[in-house]
Amino acid sequence: IVPFLGPLLGLLT
């Protein structure tokens, strides 16, 4: 699991 996915999902939602 990539670490940037966390903040990325937060920005997308």
Curated annotation (Swiss-Prot):
<dbReference type="GO" id="GO:0005576">
    <property type="term" value="C:extracellular region"/>
</dbReference>
<feature type="modified residue" description="Threonine amide">
    <location>
        <position position="13"/>
    </location>
</feature>
<keyword id="KW-1213">G-protein coupled receptor impairing toxin</keyword>
<dbReference type="GO" id="GO:0090729">
    <property type="term" value="F:toxin activity"/>
</dbReference>
<protein>
    <recommendedName>
        <fullName>Chemotactic peptide</fullName>
    </recommendedName>
</protein>
<dbReference type="GO" id="GO:0006935">
    <property type="term" value="P:chemotaxis"/>
</dbReference>
<keyword id="KW-0027">Amidation</keyword>
<comment type="function">
    <text>Mast cell degranulating peptide. Induces the chemotaxis of neutrophils. Its mast cell degranulation activity may be related to the activation of G-protein coupled receptors in mast cells as well as interaction with other proteins located in cell endosomal membranes in the mast cells.</text>
</comment>
<keyword id="KW-0467">Mast cell degranulation</keyword>
<comment type="similarity">
    <text>Belongs to the MCD family. Protonectin subfamily.</text>
</comment>
<keyword id="KW-0964">Secreted</keyword>
<keyword id="KW-0800">Toxin</keyword>
<keyword id="KW-0145">Chemotaxis</keyword>
